[in-house]
């Protein structure tokens, strides 16, 4: 038998480190009924050496654990599970790893079998590189804007280099979500700053914060220069095809704009949260507003917006291309 541990490992706000209480609870419960033949596989994201601390608390030998980090994306999780880019297995017990590998024998992708620490690092460094790539595009966006270049043409020309690629290579208000921010914090926490200098990795979050400020300032400047009556941010979640508001760039931009612009609203057709006040603000627009597309949205939303814009000559509309 194989037991998968798939519990959250959020960031503890007070200590700014990984919170292992859910993982500890799950491991403890499994340990109470454990037998030597049971393959315990941790899919939860956990920094190197933290699992040893958890196992010590519950009286379990950490060397008996196997690891199988998940790489599912919100909005495409089912497809990602059945069609993964790769499967990573980690551990020191070869017999348990063999059983785990047999479970995935029907999957058409490379299976990487490695040690526990390496399997954990693969997940963390993947979630470090992706926001690094997004931050590069956003910094490039600011440089292109400053230089007066054509944003779409420049990014396409760079991305067509097959060493770079166009996937995950578009500008955004900033990046967010439930994984990238916390994983980057944890990466920067599990190495000794006195012994290891990682200037690139240690500044990714700062780059993102700077870009969020830049986004807000550009929206504000455009709003003021055109003497508009309000701003409509289109898309509330942290990315398209999800309703997850955690660490949403839209939320951050909204807060920054709200301090100086009275009429700032967020338009979203996917979010269904009882804590959000809903009203047909868009249908009642009769004064000049700035529409900002925070990320690509579905055709239905764009068709509705285009109809509203057609019916009003006083609306300024910009896709994400500040």
Where are these regions (language model features)?
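Structural/interface elements that position substrates and couple domains in central-metabolism enzymes
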Residues: 1-322
